[in-house]
């Protein structure tokens, strides 16, 4: 029921407004604009289901790829399936009897050994949610804070890191780092719907959003009810999270705090430890009491820049004469570990892929990672990682040769002596030990790997940073 989310309007004196009038502090022109906006908002669902809006949403979902939901319809099949069901879906939405599909729950590993539950809507639901997001965003986006960088047009993680560095360089080096525990699973539905209703008066749209929020989740074949949280695999989730956490941004702005927020990852920058302590108490109270969110006490704290990381970046002092409170960016240990894990997955011997397919995936990961961390001091660690990665590729080739006789022939073809080739092809050593041995280092050389498409991280880094004059690793 839309009345459940109705919020009373107030005039500039803070008094409730029952009738628009000049005496209540609202001009006739303002009344006309408000009424016009309300009329547009009341008809939002008609815009959501317009053919060009649905087509735009469809193309967006296809471009983002992703896995199938509970109905098993893949991205490849989506265009055909959606065109067949589109008219039926539109009519059901307009009539208010559209039934949403359950969400598929998939557990994905986190860096700390734990798992995160990802809620994946069906591909059809993702198209509809994207269409709603396209119409909701213009209403909320203009009011969002300039210091909110996550999931917003013309905003990105590097801008958030740059703003953080600017704060630190200005002397705000006592950082309140608050970690929200399972934020996406803890979002209060009633609170979120109330915030949306302040801008959206369309009953059908509100009803649709509420159904998506309450859709059950299917985990290991069993359906579970959901009474809070937003599914992380939904196209609507980023916008909904920003709508809720915009209340936090407003509170921090009202109090004059210097902050940076990227989705649910936020930090506040203070001049002194005492100021940081007081700020932490107030903001944690606001999060618990007003937004009904849980704080991860173990991961939260007040930190100095050298003990603080944000979005994969860390900070170290420059130690240059006359550069007090100046820091340079480094890559955090967690980000290095994550890169190595991704490369390890691609080069796992049991992963069914040709050598060329592995190289293509490695290049994609390398370019994305190096572009993101461009401008950091990483050459030394890149060289170590390159040596490890080349051995992983040699291991893949060795495993691909399989039988001892094939291994012997290939080693001879690549320049090994008859005796060495025979001995190594029959060795009892494990594949990883052989990959690091001289026999593969002198046969499957760097030059031969390059001929098959391999490019080292060091070489790519130097291409992206031509000002660095250190020679590439050989």
Segments (PLM) and residue ranges:
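Extended C-terminal regions of large enzymes
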Residues: 392, 397, 401-474
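Short, solvent-exposed helix-loop connector elements
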Residues: 117, 225-230, 328, 344-358, ...
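Core structural elements
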Residues: 49-54, 102-104, 111, 213, ...
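A glycine-rich phosphate-binding loop feature that marks nucleotide/adenosyl-phosphate handling sites
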Residues: 299-308, 361-365, 382-390, 405-414
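Non-catalytic, polymerase-adjacent accessory regions of viral genome-replication enzymes
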Residues: 1-83, 87
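A conserved non-catalytic segment of reverse transcriptases
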Residues: 214, 290-355, 360, 365-367
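Short amphipathic alpha-helical coiled-coil/interface segments
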Residues: 82, 86, 283, 386-393
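Conserved polymerase palm-domain catalytic core
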Residues: 92-107, 111, 143-307
């Amino acid at each position: 029921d839309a009345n459940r989310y109705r919020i009373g309007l107030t005039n500039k004196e803070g008094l409730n407004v029952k009738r628009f009038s000049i005496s209540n502090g609202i001009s006739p022109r303002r009344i006309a604009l408000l009424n016009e906006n309300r009329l547009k908002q009341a008809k939002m669902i008609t815009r959501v289901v317009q053919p060009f809006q649905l087509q735009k949403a469809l193309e967006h979902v296809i471009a983002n790829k992703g896995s199938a939901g509970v109905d098993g319809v893949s991205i490849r099949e989506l265009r055909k399936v959606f065109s067949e069901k589109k008219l039926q879906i539109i009519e059901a939405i307009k009539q208010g009897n559209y039934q949403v599909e359950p969400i598929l729950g998939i557990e994905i590993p986190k860096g700390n050994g734990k798992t995160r539950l990802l809620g994946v809507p069906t591909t059809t639901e993702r198209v509809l949610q994207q269409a709603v997001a396209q119409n909701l965003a213009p209403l909320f986006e203009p009011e969002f804070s300039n210091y909110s960088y996550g999931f917003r047009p013309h905003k990105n993680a590097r801008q958030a890191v740059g703003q953080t560095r600017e704060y630190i360089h200005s002397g705000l080096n006592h950082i309140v780092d608050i970690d929200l525990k399972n934020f996406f699973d803890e979002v209060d539905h009633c609170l979120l719907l109330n915030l949306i209703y302040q801008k959206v008066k369309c009953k059908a749209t509100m009803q649709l959003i509420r159904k998506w929020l309450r859709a059950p989740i299917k985990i290991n074949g069993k359906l579970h009810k959901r009474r809070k949280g937003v599914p992380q695999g939904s196209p609507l989730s980023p916008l909904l999270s920003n709508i809720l956490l915009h209340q936090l941004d407003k509170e921090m702005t009202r109090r004059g705090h210097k902050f940076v927020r990227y989705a649910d990852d936020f930090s506040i920058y203070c001049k002194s430890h005492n100021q940081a302590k007081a700020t932490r108490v107030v903001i944690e109270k606001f999060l618990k009491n007003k937004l009904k969110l849980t704080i991860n006490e173990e991961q939260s704290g007040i930190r100095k820049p050298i003990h603080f990381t944000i979005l994969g970046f860390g900070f170290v002092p420059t130690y240059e004469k006359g550069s007090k409170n100046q820091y340079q960016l480094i890559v955090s240990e967690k980000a290095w570990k994550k890169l190595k894990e991704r490369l390890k997955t691609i080069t796992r011997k049991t992963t069914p892929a040709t050598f060329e397919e592995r190289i293509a995936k490695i290049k994609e990961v390398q370019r994305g990672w190096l572009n993101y961390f461009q401008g950091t001091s990483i050459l030394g660690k890149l060289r170590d990682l390159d040596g490890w990665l080349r051995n992983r590729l040699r291991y893949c080739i060795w495993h691909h040769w399989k039988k001892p006789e094939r291994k012997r022939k290939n080693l001879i073809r690549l320049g090994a002596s008859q005796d060495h080739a025979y001995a190594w092809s029959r060795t009892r050593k494990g594949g990883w030990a052989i990959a690091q041995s001289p026999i593969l280092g002198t046969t499957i050389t760097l030059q031969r790997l390059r001929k098959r498409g391999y490019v080292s991280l060091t070489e790519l880094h130097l291409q992206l940073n031509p000002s660095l004059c250190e020679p590439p690793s050989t």
